[in-house]
Design a protein with these regions (language model features):
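Extended, charge-rich alpha-helical interface modules
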Residues: 1-63
Length: 63
């Protein structure tokens, strides 16, 4: 694997870890206590992170 390809794999691993933590947070009581505007931002963030993760998976699949 080329160095630039390994960086993409590493990036995907890091992103997946962060996304997993965010999704767990979204199911928690702290999230439920946040103002609706902040809940909306966090929900949008998780959706964008999921799309980003999909793009990285596609890139890795093309190696």
């Amino acid at each position: 694997m080329q160095p630039h390809q390994q960086r993409v794999v590493d990036e995907k691993v890091e992103l997946s870890d962060k996304l997993e933590k965010l999704l767990k947070f979204l199911d928690g009581s702290i999230y439920a206590s946040l103002p609706p505007s902040e809940q909306s931002r966090l929900s949008r963030q998780s959706l964008i992170m999921q799309l980003y993760e999909q793009v990285l998976e596609e890139r890795i699949g093309s190696f």
